[in-house]
Curated annotation (Swiss-Prot):
The keyword Transcription regulation does not apply. It is found in: Nucleus; Chromosome. It comes from Bos taurus (Bovine). The modification Phosphoserine is found at residues 9, 36-37, 40. Pfam families: TP1 (PF02079). This is Spermatid nuclear transition protein 1. Keywords: Chromosome, Developmental protein, Differentiation, DNA-binding, Nucleosome core, Nucleus, Phosphoprotein, Spermatogenesis. Plays a key role in the replacement of histones to protamine in the elongating spermatids of mammals. In condensing spermatids, loaded onto the nucleosomes, where it promotes the recruitment and processing of protamines, which are responsible for histone eviction. Residues 1-42 have a biased composition (Basic residues). Signal peptide: none annotated. Testis.
């Protein structure tokens, strides 16, 4: 029982330690990407339109 408990705690600890960085990085990048993608997409479209109209 003690061994299984140790393994469980270690696994949980390892997962917790390993996931935060990935999770934070992923969520941050996803959120940033989503927000910027919507804004940048609109901006890119406007820029392309302006460039085309200017050209």
């Amino acid at each position: 029982m003690s061994t299984s408990r140790k393994l469980k705690s270690q696994g949980m600890r390892r997962g917790k330690n390993r996931t935060p960085h990935k999770g934070v990085k992923r969520s941050g990048s996803k959120r940033k990407y989503r927000k910027s993608s919507l804004k940048s997409r609109k901006r890119c479209d406007d820029a392309n339109r302006n460039l085309r109209s200017h050209l």
